[in-house]
């Protein structure tokens, strides 16, 4: 059975590597094959593989067809304003007058949904709506604009689309201010009532949001500064309600109910009608059931988040086997947990938190098994101390590959932080936090006092974490290469520790740590050298000295048109050297494309310094992220024309100027005058290696295109390019047929937002390129577009089709 369970789980994982979700007919074939394999003893395990794969893909099929099953047209949905009815199913996050929440759609324009689905809405309340306080459980009629679930698609960036799918959210949108917005029912869920009461009684304190995270899994109020400390010290896992928290609730409630049952005269306190039936129950079984109910309630308060659900599943299986008298090996218990999660929460496999928690449990089990000889001690206290120490060492080391892969950074002080934080959180802070939650139901004054006490103790721990954060290089940002080095080294160590019998000859070691280290000196040398290489690479900066190129040697370079929505950001790249053309936008809400897209991309590629930053013009969607960029990465030179955003030492982009960078020639073709405010002041640049060329056009209109064509015909400049980055996101005001014919590109790239309100790129413009047999690429459908030039060849890659072609991270739409 263990092999079947393992193959089922592996099949679910393998399904994630497919580029599309097959049609239902193919899935039925998979099921038929699985059944046929199951009835043959030799192939029974393989049946689990196909069933696991089919189950995951079937859930993907259902998600993708949420629109179709309700007879809704995706494209028409995004173009109109709709009136919807439904219920808020999450505690809204609030930022000033901005609310964000998950909404279960029941009706759309009066049409009842065959299968209601979730949408993620934001609602900015106006003065007429200021009396409205959205809450979980409320039913509303709202006027909204929605789009299918979508997110930016770039290397190194956060996949919002995967996150939405993980939460089963099918669409996103916003509420329009309208008189039709009305509250239909004010029935509030118990979770929301307790949350509101808790917030009302919570003392004013910078760390108060951490108590909300520990009690209700609500982390949206945690400040950026607090998150930075948690990340730098590797302690963010302590505020995600998971196995540690549920384990404390389970054990604490079990002990409490057991003491109550044994110490209190229940036969005198309880009515005979209740007490008499209890006599027939085994006391420990009754206590187990009460403990299970208590833990379930805490998981409900945490909204059954993925780490919570994983831990709850493990505990529930343990309780049920105890109650039913079933004996399970540790391995089967773990495999049953994984398969149960795949069955009831299949999209949890898309969550980084799921994999971190699963691997953490595996590491704990393996460590206790492999290092059991180290834990031998006559005194129980020292056995516990040694156990906690070695488990924390193992978790810190063996989770490094996952943390570096998911977050592109590792904490160098996490071991020291967790050695104190874990016991303090486990035995003091979390119990006090939960106690305040319980007392809130009986006495708000006492609950408030416990909250204040918890915050005071938490403040002491916080001072220690701040001390560690202030250490030099407490948090290292890692590139893909550095993450791979870490993964290889840790895998070698894991193999030697948990697999290789030659590493541990327990009879010879006999608790002699010196002998153990002596036998492992080769391995320790590898670890030390690799650590030095990773550290030096992560802290070094790259000088922007131009590389000497042999004229006969082809130059390998890339032009990466990043997916920044309705804006522009292009990275011209050679290895770890890069030039950035435009920065994307920044918005009043604090959302900034430089922080979300550009910096993660540069970090992913080990680019610690930009040789140049070129700003085409000062519109927000092109230059909004410049200030944040200046503050977060070293820049050799900024080329910008608008005086409003220029600084001393910045260069200019003017017709006739050019420069050579890493063997590439950058010819500035426009503007003629130093302005940079309007679209027609955009810095137009032709990049060429002598064989291939790419033309960057900013937001110029047909008027400037005509001037450039005229100059090209007079041999004053060259416009010919292999790839054209279309002007102004493909608007009707640009990309004239005369300009296209003069440039003569073989491919064009549009940088535009997904289903944007301006319908860019315009159909008319796209048709012009199609008529000229020019291949079209667009970031709004394809994600990041990479123009790859190497070995005297040019090829274009799309992120969704070529670089990350996985069904769970992409929409059902077809790629160009």
Cite the ranges covered by each PLM segment.
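Residue-level signal for inorganic ion chemistry
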Residues: 11, 86, 353, 399, ...
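Membrane-interface helix/helix-cap signal primarily in integral membrane proteins
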Residues: 53-237, 591, 596-604, 609, ...
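Alpha-helical transmembrane bundle and helix-membrane interface signal
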Residues: 151-153, 259-283, 322-333, 369-381
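Non-globular, low-confidence helical/coil segments that flank catalytic cores
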Residues: 99, 109-111, 129-132, 136-143, ...
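Aromatic-rich juxtamembrane segments at the membrane interface
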Residues: 166-314, 397, 666, 693-698, ...
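N-terminal leader/targeting segments
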Residues: 1-81, 136, 172, 179, ...
């Amino acid at each position: 059975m263990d092999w079947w369970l393992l193959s089922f789980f592996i099949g679910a994982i393998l399904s994630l590597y497919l580029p599309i979700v097959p049609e239902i007919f193919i899935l039925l074939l998979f099921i038929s094959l699985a059944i046929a394999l199951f009835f043959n003893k030799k192939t029974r395990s393989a049946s689990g593989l196909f069933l696991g794969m089919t189950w995951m893909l079937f859930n993907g099929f259902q998600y993708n067809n949420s629109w179709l099953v309700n007879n809704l047209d995706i494209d028409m949905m995004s173009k109109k304003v709709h009136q919807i009815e439904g219920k808020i199913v999450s505690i809204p996050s609030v930022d000033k007058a901005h609310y964000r929440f998950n909404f279960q759609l029941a009706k759309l324009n009066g049409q009842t949904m065959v299968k209601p689905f979730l949408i993620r809405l934001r609602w900015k309340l106006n003065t007429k709506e200021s009396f409205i306080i959205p809450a979980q459980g409320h039913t509303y009629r709202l006027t909204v604009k929605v789009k299918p679930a979508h997110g930016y698609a770039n290397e190194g960036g956060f996949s919002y689309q995967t996150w939405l799918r993980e939460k089963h959210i099918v669409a996103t949108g916003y509420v329009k201010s309208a008189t039709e917005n009305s509250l239909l029912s004010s029935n509030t869920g118990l979770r929301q009532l307790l949350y509101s009461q808790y917030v009302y009684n919570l003392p004013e304190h910078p760390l108060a949001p951490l108590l909300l995270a520990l009690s209700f899994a609500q982390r949206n109020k945690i400040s950026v500064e607090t998150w930075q400390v948690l990340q730098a010290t590797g302690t963010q896992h302590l505020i995600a309600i998971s196995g540690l928290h549920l384990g404390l609730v389970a054990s604490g409630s079990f002990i409490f109910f057991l003491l109550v049952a044994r110490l209190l005269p229940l036969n005198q306190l309880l009515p005979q009608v209740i007490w008499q039936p209890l006599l027939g129950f085994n006391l420990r079984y009754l206590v187990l059931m009460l403990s299970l109910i208590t833990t379930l309630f805490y998981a409900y308060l945490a909204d059954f988040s993925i780490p919570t659900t994983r831990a709850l599943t493990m505990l529930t299986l343990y309780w049920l086997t105890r109650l039913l008298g079933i004996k399970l090996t540790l391995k089967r218990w773990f495999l049953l947990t994984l398969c149960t999660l795949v069955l009831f929460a299949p999209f949890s496999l898309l969550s980084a938190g799921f994999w971190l928690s699963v691997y953490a449990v595996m590491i704990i089990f393996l460590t206790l098994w492999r290092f059991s000889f180290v834990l031998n001690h006559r005194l129980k206290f020292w056995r516990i101390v040694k156990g906690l120490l070695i488990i924390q060492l193992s978790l810190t080391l063996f989770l490094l590959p996952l943390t570096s892969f998911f977050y592109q950074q590792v904490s160098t002080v996490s071991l020291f932080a967790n050695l104190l934080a874990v016991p303090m959180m486990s035995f003091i802070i979390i119990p006090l936090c939960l106690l305040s939650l319980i007392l809130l139901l009986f006495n708000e004054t006492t609950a408030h006092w416990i909250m204040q006490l918890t915050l005071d103790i938490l403040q002491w721990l916080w001072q220690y974490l701040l001390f560690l954060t202030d250490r030099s290089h407490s948090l290292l940002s890692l590139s893909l290469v550095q993450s791979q080095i870490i993964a290889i080294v840790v895998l070698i160590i894991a193999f030697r520790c948990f697999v290789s019998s030659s590493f541990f000859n327990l009879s010879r070691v006999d608790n002699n740590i010196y002998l153990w280290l002596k036998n492992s000196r080769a391995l320790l040398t590898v670890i030390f050298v690799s650590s030095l290489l990773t550290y030096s690479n992560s802290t070094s900066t790259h000088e922007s000295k131009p590389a000497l190129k042999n004229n006969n040697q082809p130059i390998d370079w890339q032009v990466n048109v990043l997916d920044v929505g309705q804006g522009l950001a292009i990275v011209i790249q050679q290895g770890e050297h890069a030039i950035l053309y435009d920065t994307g936008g920044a918005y009043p809400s604090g959302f900034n494309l430089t922080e979300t897209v550009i910096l993660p991309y540069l970090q992913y590629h080990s680019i610690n310094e930009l040789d140049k930053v070129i700003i085409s013009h000062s519109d927000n969607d092109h230059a909004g992220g410049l200030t944040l960029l200046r503050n977060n990465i070293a820049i050799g030179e900024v080329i910008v024309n608008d005086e409003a955003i220029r600084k001393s030492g910045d260069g200019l982009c003017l017709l006739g100027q050019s420069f050579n960078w890493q063997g590439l020639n950058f010819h500035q073709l426009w503007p003629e005058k130093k302005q940079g405010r309007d679209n027609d002041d955009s810095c137009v640049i032709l990049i060429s290696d002598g064989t291939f060329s790419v033309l960057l056009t900013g937001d110029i209109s047909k008027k400037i295109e005509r001037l450039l064509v005229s100059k090209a015909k007079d041999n004053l400049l060259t416009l010919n390019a292999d790839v054209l980055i279309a002007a102004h996101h493909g608007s009707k005001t640009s990309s004239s047929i005369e300009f296209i014919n003069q440039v003569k590109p073989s491919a064009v790239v549009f940088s535009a937002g997904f289903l944007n309100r301006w319908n860019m790129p315009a159909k008319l413009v796209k048709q012009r390129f199609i008529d000229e047999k020019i291949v079209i690429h667009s970031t709004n459908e394809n994600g990041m577009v990479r123009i790859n030039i190497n070995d005297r060849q040019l090829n274009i890659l799309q992120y969704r089709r070529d670089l990350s072609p996985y069904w769970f991270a992409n929409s059902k739409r077809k790629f160009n």
